[in-house]
């Protein structure tokens, strides 16, 4: 199989010699193209070992040179046939072409399955899911390429949710993009920025936060202060120039409850949950321009338009992560305080009635449940970053906590659907996308389903551990951190099995721990499971 994969390389090397013998001058040109667009670029760019995505397109020029040499293989074989047959004619070129077609045929046969994307639609579906999780006329703030381009594709090509305004915060450092956001796009209204161009065009790339006032300052007053040209609103620098700054670390964002309900940001029945004021905490002493523009947006939107975020990272420096609602993919800014609980590890509140139809009917997952679809590391990472599978478990837990009529059945349906749409055979186990399912299955009384998932996850962890433990010396040191991680995951589900009284699961894991040298004193007793920590409670 390896030899078949190297056919192209062997042909390239042989035909490189053929061109050198027949046409040295042009050989030099192609060789320089190969070197300068390949090895030289590797040295020049000094590319890091880990990249967010494949960067092989940088070396496309060297691929062209490689292909030129492979193409010379037809000429080389044709000359060989002429020498052997001692005849020259059109048939010699035909025979050479037919024989050489085996090269791309072999390469296709060996590599097609790894590169076939005919059934894979995950890149498009990520954008679909983000857009469908937003309210009408919303502004969705995103951060990177992976949560921007799929949304643009859905809007501009497939005409999906063109009422939503997509705003990439990493572009807000450019005055051209801010100007663009101030204009209408498709069916989406402009972003209600208020800062004049003189305050963001080629100035204020970084903005100081100097707390002249200890108390929280109304966000509108703070932006009026920043917008002012009064010399008293500036701070001098050592070179004599002055710069704008924000005068408070805590900003108060008043809540217009009627507007929030009218825009669909909060349900009428949740009116009493709303706070009167949302407080921003500017944790750093300096903001970049994108953060300044987000503050400007918040100071002026008056809760008339929903604001969604694809990543909570955008809000961490503004101290707003306690005012979010998770809608399956995006996070909605809501005037409801939901403090982050480290024991649970979930950011924001959740409305199970809102998220249930989205998860069960609306969202798409790129056909990853189809075994024909190759789920590469890039898809794995994006599903992990968006919390796609654990969203099902989180919604299930919300139903179980509420405990209303039919809520348990909905919870189980969510758990089953999450594993069906993104099966472990395709989407690899991680602690974050598996452990919540175990908690919820056991809390719902679905012990057999919980056991099956737990044992499958445990077997996967044990295979990793057996592989890592086979390394010794320096290599063993290199994987020691991975061993610790897998042991920690195994220990967590072991304690959960004990807490839930799953005797067969505990016994299976006890057997494995004994192979690692554990004694009976170190293990849970099957008939007397141990007590869990707070973090292991199925329903917090």
List where the protein language model places each region.
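ER/secretory pathway lumenal C-terminal domains and tails of membrane proteins involved
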Residues: 1-4, 9-10, 14-59, 65-137, ...
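Residues that form or flank phosphate/diphosphate-binding pockets in enzymes
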Residues: 149
């Amino acid at each position: 199989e390896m030899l078949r994969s190297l056919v192209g390389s062997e042909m390239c090397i042989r035909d490189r010699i053929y061109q050198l013998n027949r046409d040295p001058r042009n050989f030099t040109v192609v060789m320089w193209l190969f070197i300068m667009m390949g090895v030289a670029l590797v040295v020049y760019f000094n590319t890091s070992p880990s990249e967010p995505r494949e960067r092989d397109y940088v070396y496309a020029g060297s691929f062209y040179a490689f292909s030129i040499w492979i193409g010379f293989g037809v000429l080389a074989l044709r000359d060989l046939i002429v020498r052997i047959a001692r005849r020259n004619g059109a048939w010699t070129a035909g025979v050479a072409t037919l024989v050489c077609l085996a090269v791309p045929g072999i390469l296709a046969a060996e590599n097609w399955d790894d590169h076939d994307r005919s059934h894979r639609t995950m890149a498009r579906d990520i954008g679909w899911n983000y857009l469908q999780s937003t309210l009408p006329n919303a502004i969705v703030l995103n951060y990177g390429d992976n949560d921007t381009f799929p949304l643009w594709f859905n809007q501009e090509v497939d005409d999906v949710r063109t009422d939503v305004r997509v705003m990439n915060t990493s572009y807000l450092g450019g005055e051209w993009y801010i100007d663009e956001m101030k204009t209408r796009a498709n069916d989406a209204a402009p972003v209600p920025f208020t800062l004049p161009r003189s305050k963001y065009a080629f100035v204020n790339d970084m903005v100081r936060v100097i707390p002249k006032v200890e108390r929280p300052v109304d966000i509108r007053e703070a932006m009026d202060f920043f917008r002012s040209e009064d010399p008293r609103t500036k701070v001098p620098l050592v070179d004599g120039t002055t710069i704008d700054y924000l005068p408070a670390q805590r900003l108060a964002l008043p809540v217009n409850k009627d507007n929030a309900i009218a825009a669909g940001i909060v349900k009428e029945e949740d009116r009493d949950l709303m706070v009167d004021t949302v407080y921003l905490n500017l944790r750093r002493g300096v903001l970049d321009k994108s953060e300044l523009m987000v503050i400007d947006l918040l100071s002026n939107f008056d809760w008339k338009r929903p604001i969604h975020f694809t990543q909570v990272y955008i809000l961490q420096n503004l101290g707003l992560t306690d005012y979010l609602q998770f809608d399956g993919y995006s996070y909605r800014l809501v005037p409801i305080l939901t403090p982050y609980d480290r024991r649970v590890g979930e950011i924001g509140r959740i409305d199970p009635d809102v998220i249930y139809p989205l998860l069960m009917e609306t969202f798409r997952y790129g056909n990853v449940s189809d075994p024909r679809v190759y789920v590469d590391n890039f898809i794995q990472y994006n599903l992990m970053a968006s919390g796609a599978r654990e969203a099902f478990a989180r919604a299930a837990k919300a139903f179980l906590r509420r405990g209303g009529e039919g809520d348990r059945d909905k919870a189980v349906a969510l758990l089953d659907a999450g594993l069906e749409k993104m099966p472990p055979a395709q989407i690899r186990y991680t602690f974050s996308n598996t452990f919540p399912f175990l908690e919820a299955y056991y809390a719902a009384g679905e012990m057999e389903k919980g056991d099956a998932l737990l044992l499958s996850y445990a077997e996967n962890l044990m295979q990793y551990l057996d592989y890592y433990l086979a390394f010794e010396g320096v290599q063993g040191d290199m994987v020691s951190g991975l061993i610790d991680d897998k042991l920690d995951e195994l220990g967590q589900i072991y304690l959960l099995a004990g807490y839930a009284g799953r005797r067969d699961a505990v016994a299976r894991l006890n057997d494995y721990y004994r192979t690692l040298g554990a004694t009976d004193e170190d293990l849970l007793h099957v008939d007397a499971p141990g007590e869990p920590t707070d973090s292991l409670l199925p329903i917090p």
